[in-house]
Amino acid sequence: MKNIKIFLFIGVLMSASVGWTQENPGSEFVVARLKYSGGGDWYNDPSILPNLLDFMAERTNMSLGKSEAIVEIMDEDLFLYPVVFMTGHGRIHLSRPEAARLRLYLTSGGFLYADDDYGMDASFRTEIKKIFPDHELKEIPFSHPIFHSHFSFAKGAPKIHEHDGGPPKSYGIFHEGRMVIFYTFDTNISDGWADPNIHNDPPEVRQKAFEMGTNIMVYALTN
């Protein structure tokens, strides 16, 4: 299961463990934003991933890129990225070939982080069943390592934006014991990574969002 992850992502993992620098070509960690069909705004908040990478560069010993990559599921480059991120407010649609390819990516060592930006929850849950029809999204307990991989969140994912007044929720799908999808709902974590003038979040709220984002990336690269 982990062979592809070992061979394709080894530069990133070595970077995370021994602190490679820009002198090591090809070792930089870059998050790929997933461009999906269905009409949802997959491109939402273009500053979020570059800002998260900047934060991580200051607080980890990882060698990091400065910008996001944009990848579609059927792109050959999909398997070059250890972590794929998706967000949006609207509908997602996966064709059968896309669902099969995303399953292959995830079961070969890849990791998907999805953050509902208020409006994609129902669609996301429907489409994920195409990828893993026999798996259910399971709520992640606060004790899970993803909440403690670099910073500690004793009560799970932080609440960044209020919508319907519910508590922040975190879910996962596991394949052969490994979390392959991490999904946050009613949290808006990635909104907290946006430029300060976009949502006018207080500094302490943005800090928590960046810290949780760092946890997600560190966990994805080390599990």
Task: Map each language-model feature to its residues.
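Aromatic-Pro/Gly-enriched surface loop or interdomain linker
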Residues: 20-83, 87-90, 180, 188-189, ...
